[in-house]
Amino acid sequence: MTVKTKPVKKADLRILQSLEKKVLWLSMWMVHNANHLRQSVDGLKVGGHQASSASITTIMTALYFNVLKVQDRVAVKPHASPVFHAIQYMLGRQTEDKLKAFRSLGGTQSYPSRTKDTDGVDFSTGSVGLGVAMTLFASMVQDYTRLNEAVNKPLAKVNKPGRMIAVMGDAELDEGNIYEAMLEGWKYDVRNLWWIIDYNRQSLDGVVSDGLFRKIQDFFANVGWNVVPLKYGKKLEKVFALQGGDTLRQWIDDCPNDLYSALTFKGQSGEKDAWRSPLKKDLRGVHGIKSILEDHDDNMLHALMTNLAGHDMEAVLEAFHSVADDRPQCFIAYTIKGHGTPLAGHRDNHAGLMNLEQMDVFRSKMQIPEGSEWSAYDNLLIEPETAKKFCLQAPFNKRPPQENEPPKITIPDNLPLNFRSSTSTQASFGNILHELSRGNTDLASRIVTTSPDVTVSTNLGPWVNQRGVFSLDVRNDVFRDEKVASAQKWLRHGTGQHFELGIAENNLFIMLAALGLSGPLFGTRLLPIGTLYDPFIARGLDSLNYACYQDARFMLVATPAGITLAPEGGAHQSISSPLIGIGQPGLSSYEPAYADELAVIMRWAFESMQAENGGSIYLRLSTRAIDQPSREMKPELENQLIKGAYWHIPPTDGARIAIVYSGAVVPEVIEAYEQLKEEIPELGIMAITSYDRLYHDWQRSQVENIEAVSYTHLTLPTRSLV
């Protein structure tokens, strides 16, 4: 589809081109200052990816100073962090001191961070590929918050949907999680999603394979995306229209990526006839080529041959403003790594830094006098006041600097729980959600569940039967319509409260991240619950860490876990997952043994997921049915089991030994106690509900040099029974 758009105003284009140069300068200087000028206390290289930043300055300038609206959200590729912070500085949303402290304590972060940066990062990025997928799932969550009537009741107005935008490096397409996410997006008919590929054709160790763009086009087209190649800038397009221009275009099209990069480096280094020699050799006798070459000296020819669309402000703006619908868009923007700097095109430029001599050359080229390095608006081709006014009035800059805190969700004093005298924690989990699903509470309306194709086997089935599966299209349950008996009745509609995912754990955790940030992103607080088999946490561990790193709030229910997985065989055992629960920041892990413990922990979890200093929760549950205690859950007991442990059977005075357990092994523990109590009458049983909380409380006490909170009321000797 061809869409006609109004041309960019010449005055605005001139301003944006000037701002682009300032963004390039500030981002390069930020890295230079951190590595060569700032005092180093340890002599370690700081780094900062100057070349990766230089390739994206045109696109980022176009986005933040012209294209983005308040409701749009952006994931900036990790290695473009200096560009992002330079732009926020020019928008008045970042301080000079933080730029000077880039990659040091209290300064701007190496990679954009929601939790550590202070200038409005929408999505943390890094590891590579995760932020890209995050925009896709955020788009799905945006649709959910807009379509779910129960969620939208508190909202006075449903605003126009924003575009979820990922500015990504081409090497990120090597990450498999991107393709897993794309497939899930296709299933859900994802919309309002832009992925802008910085196609500089260079990665950490060299140059990418020729023809990669064709594969990219095929991948995206196959799942319903509109693919927009941005290859040639306006200068080249004008020359292509001349006699011999078609042949010149074909020469560039056929030029291997590594040769093009090498010629780019030679050209920017000022080598005589860097481009002219191969063009004269390869295009000898082609009518019109001689005239084109004669009309350009070496500098002009270098500027022409590197006039790729990703560095042409007019071409970039035309492409972005040509989007006429909410279909997902993939922009393949041809760029040059290190563009406009002495590093341009060199195969080793990924981790390369301009040395002092190169920076002097670059400073002279950018016309930045000494003492003006950190100026946001001076030394441009436009007046400083004009530049400042344009920046401060950018559409994106109308976004409030601080995200609004959505109202908290009311949690009842007790969660509904009806259980048999013998039951498992997994069954109790399903029972609690089923009871909630039958009510009309604020809590029930804000719970959203998701699972990677293990919904039924993790006991979410009754919840889904009551609440439905989220879908942009209404789809009936065919088995039910055909009167085929089934325990499941899955209706799909826009108010469903379950996202059914394929078997891809990365998708689960990034989906939970997007749902868990729905409050700050879209103004609607949700309480997401994700389920999976406990061993497969390891399949998506980097994505889990990514979700926790940006302080997304969710409940992760891993079930079955522990010994109840024995029939699954050796590859399905959850051996190391307790260590994941202990080691993962932002995630509190629990392993209750009884149904009443689970109800208390889940209620606390829903509160913690909303607390300023709270976090996410990881529950390891079991399918092993055990006899339930007949007891009153008093506040003191609730407090102890939330803190991590309580006395299941208190020891008597003089006790020097105790049996300590966690989870569904309690029948064996009680049996052992019965066998030992005659010989050791003072013996007690300690129930650990959270080895995570217990350990971190002890660790904190060591750091703070204070007495640990006592759960045992006795000193355990070196000889103990566990």
Residue ranges and their predicted role:
Residues A11, I15-V23, S27, V31-Q39, ...:
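Cofactor-binding active-site loop characterized by glycine-rich and histidine/acidic residues
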Residues P78-V83, M168-E175, D198-S203, G233-K235, ...:
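Acidic, glycine-rich active-site loops and adjacent beta-strand->loop/helix elements
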Residues T95-S104, D189-W195, N222, A547-A561:
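A glycine-rich helix N-cap at a beta->alpha junction
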Residues R114-G120, G162-M164, I196-D198, S291-A303, ...:
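Gly-rich Lys/Arg/Thr-decorated short loops/hinges at beta-loop-alpha junctions or inter-strand turns
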Residues V141, E149-L155, N431-L436, E482-R492, ...:
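Glycine-/acidic-rich phosphate or pyrophosphate-binding loops and their flanking alpha/beta elements
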Residues Y199-L417:
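Long, well-ordered, tryptophan-enriched scaffold segments
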Residues F390-A538, L544-A552, E636-I642, Y646, ...:
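Non-catalytic terminal/interface segments that mediate subunit docking, oligomerization
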Residues T712-T718:
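Conserved small/polar residues in nucleotide/adenosyl-binding loops
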